[in-house]
Amino acid sequence: IVGPSGAGKSTLFELILGNLKAQRGTIHVENCAMVFQDPYSSFHPSYTVINQIKDVASLEGMESYLETMKLDAELLEKLPHELSGGQLQRCSILRALLMKPDLLLLDEPTSALDNVTQLDVMQMLMKHLGEMAMLLITHEIDLAKWCADEIIEIG
């Protein structure tokens, strides 16, 4: 999903998640996970990252994800504010994948990552396309063309 700022891309995700009520019609989605643009908004500041992952997901398969996303397991023992934005965003993606959702919503998930890590993370996400559907919000049209089956332009 691409479009200018303020076009309603994130609002669409809020509707899908049920955080906003549709004025007409209904939206019904089960087993959905989301990676927000700002990773600090999705982690409680007083609990370690690993505890917040364990609260919502199984840790099965975590080692391979850690390697792909260039994350050290020791980072997961830290509090969110002790990590860089890029590290915490990768932890957010890790948590979402470990939830094994049917639908993964990605709101600018790699905007805080350097180009090399961004490519690694997107390639890793692409490996899981057969396991789940993904909706990606991005301002980067080249990224959308590279990874999407379909592109929806809003605005």
What is each of the regions a protein language model found here?
Residues L98-D102:
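A short, proline-enriched helix->beta-strand linker immediately N-terminal to the Walker B motif
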Residues L17:
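Helix-to-loop junction immediately C-terminal to a conserved catalytic motif
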Residues I93, V121:
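Hydrophobic anchor residue at the start of the ABC signature
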Residues L104-E108:
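Catalytic Walker B motif of ABC-type/P-loop ATPase nucleotide-binding domains
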Residues L79-L83, Q87:
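Conserved ABC ATPase signature
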Residues E131-I137:
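Conserved H-loop
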Residues D38, P45-G61:
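Q-loop/switch helix immediately C-terminal to the Walker
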